[in-house]
Curated annotation (Swiss-Prot):
It comes from Acidovorax ebreus (strain TPSY). It is found in: Cell inner membrane. This is Large-conductance mechanosensitive channel. SUPFAM superfamilies: Gated mechanosensitive channel. Keywords: Cell inner membrane, Cell membrane, Ion channel, Ion transport, Membrane, Transmembrane, Transmembrane helix, Transport. The lineage of its organism: Bacteria, Pseudomonadati, Pseudomonadota, Betaproteobacteria, Burkholderiales. Coiled coil: none annotated.
Length: 142
């Protein structure tokens, strides 16, 4: 089974233990992943698409008061509704990376926890009276 297919099944199905592990590890590694995304990955993605900072990509849904700088922070402070899709892109990439890291960790933990297949128990020894009856039968056949 390919790792992409396993990851998709993990992300879609999962179970309570996987979710609990994800929450705990996600909380612990959230800042590290945020730094990796914002400091390492998003600048490269930004260079490819011509924008270095995705957090300032937005669509204004109202009128901007005169004299307000055209930045996301300033427009939000002015109370103008905005659709901040750049921030969403950053958060979505952050989520995918974090989910993949958790998936790999849970996969490794599950690999360690897998039990070796249990061999079926040996059939019980034939009772002595049955063995004697078989011996008698075999001796009568001769």
């Amino acid at each position: 089974m390919g790792i992409a297919k396993e990851f998709r099944e993990f992300a879609v199905k999962g179970n309570v233990i996987d979710l609990a592990v994800g929450v705990i590890i996600g909380g612990a590694f959230g800042k590290i992943v945020d730094s990796v995304v914002s400091d390492l990955i998003m600048p490269v993605v930004g260079l490819v698409f011509g924008k270095l900072d995705f957090s300032n990509l937005f669509i204004v849904l109202g009128s901007v008061p005169e004299g307000t700088p055209y930045t996301l922070e300033a427009i939000r402070k002015a109370g103008v509704p905005v659709l901040a899709y750049g921030n969403f892109i950053t958060v979505a990439v952050n989520f995918v990376i974090l989910a993949f890291i958790i998936f790999v960790m849970v996969k490794q933990i599950n690999r360690l926890k897998r039990e070796t297949p249990v061999e079926p128990p040996a059939p019980p020894a034939t009772p002595e009276d049955i063995q004697l009856l078989r011996e008698i039968r075999d001796s009568l056949k001769r």
